[in-house]
Design a protein with these regions (language model features):
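Hydrophobic/basic alpha-helical segments
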Residues: 1-390
């Protein structure tokens, strides 16, 4: 988003690996754990015991194939699975660094991105990087899946269109054209970061479960209804909702309508009853405040642990050259200049996070534990949301 504010378009590539967790070579994994991460002795023996000795068979129509000992793969649903995959593919980060691209990696999800001038769009560095990554995967028994890998240009409509018109990116021998949107870890990101398609998907999924809740509501208690609502519907509204800061008022309204209907369903009030009163009774924050709640909690964690680094480095403490009353108020510096004045900048974490944090009371910002911060924050946002409401 900041690149777009600086009149640069960004190109993002989401790489997909075929049967990622099933193709990890046990011998390579253990050698890498020893040589690069210093896992030796009993710890290495335990690791080898954990990944080896597993068997599998195929069952079709009641007939089972012979049992085969697995020489590759780690349990995908295990706690260690993503960590072992990250350990196995750790050299990929060095390849990306060599080509001066930025990246995010979580288990088998890898995204490469870079920003380019719209007038001088050159995909050479991206192409060379994907070629080297494909070669490394092949040498280590893994394979990129070009049919599920995606490329997207992000920026304003003009910037995104210019980047998308620059050509295609070759992944594992196949030409992958630019997409209008990509789905990353359950969030659909479009080329203008409007989140229109993502919110449509969220609303559709919530309404499906809301209809089911209405059907069974007379048969269950209010407490059970609240549990069902939170686990099946509110969780969808809250998932990655900090990304929605700066989205259109129309999108926020669509989500708010879902939450209003949910509150009425839980309390079994009519459609013409006050949604605000239902939300207050359930002690639920409205959508906008839920977004601000998630952002504020994220900032608090970043200030305490400075992790992840790619986010913590975007937050700068507010400092004055001389001592003022604002010096000890735990404020963050808000970006200034042309970027801050652009409407698109409200979607940038480096812009909206300090703004949300600085809007909190000093009492809230000074909380010494995460639990006390969450309690104080929710109370503060609740009062702000419902004071003077009809």
């Amino acid at each position: 988003v900041i690149a777009a504010c600086n009149r640069r378009s960004s190109v993002l590539i989401a790489l997909d690996i075929s049967a990622a967790f099933d193709t990890i070579d046990h011998d390579i994994l253990c050698r890498r754990a020893d040589s690069e991460f210093g896992i030796r002795g009993p710890a290495l023996a335990w690791l080898r015991s954990f990944v080896s000795g597993r068997s599998s068979y195929v069952s079709v129509g009641g007939t089972n194939s012979p049992v085969t000992l697995n020489s590759t793969g780690v349990p995908q649903g295990s706690v260690l699975g993503p960590m072992l995959f990250a350990l196995y593919t750790s050299p990929v980060s060095k390849i990306i660094d060599h080509h001066s691209l930025q990246y995010h990696m979580y288990a088998d999800d890898t995204q490469l991105y870079t920003s380019l001038q719209p007038s001088q769009i050159d995909l050479t560095a991206i192409q060379l990087c994907t070629n080297d990554i494909h070669r490394w995967y092949a040498e280590n028994g893994m394979m990129l899946n070009p049919t599920k890998s995606e490329v997207i240009a992000v920026g304003t409509r003009v910037q995104a269109a210019a980047a998308a018109a620059s050509g295609t990116v070759e992944i594992a021998g196949s030409q992958v054209p630019f997409s209008s949107d990509v789905k990353l870890l359950g969030v659909t990101i479009d080329s203008t970061v409007s989140f229109d398609k993502h919110i449509s998907s969220v609303v559709r999924g919530c309404n499906y479960h809301l209809r089911a809740l209405r059907h069974i509501r007379p048969l269950i208690t209010t407490d059970v209804a609240k549990s069902v609502a939170c686990s099946l519907i509110s969780s969808r509204l809250d998932y990655c909702n900090s990304l929605l800061h700066g989205t259109s008022a129309k999108n926020i309204h669509r989500l708010q309508v879902v939450q209003n209907d949910l509150a009425r369903a839980v309390l079994m009030t009519g459609r013409r009853s006050s949604a605000t009163e239902s939300l207050k009774t359930l002690h639920w924050l409205p959508i906008t405040e839920r977004i601000n709640y998630k952002i504020a909690v994220t900032v608090y964690k970043l200030r305490q642990s400075h992790s992840p680094q790619y986010l913590s480095e975007l937050l700068v403490n507010y400092q004055q050259p001389r001592t003022l009353r604002s010096s000890d108020k735990l404020l963050l510096r808000e970006p200034e200049g042309p970027v801050r004045k652009l409407a698109l900048s409200t979607k940038a974490f480096s812009v909206f996070a300090p703004s949300v944090w600085n809007s909190l009371t000093l009492n809230c910002r000074m909380c010494t534990s995460l639990n006390s911060f969450k309690r104080t924050l929710k109370t503060e946002l609740f009062i702000k949301a419902y004071t003077d409401q009809p």
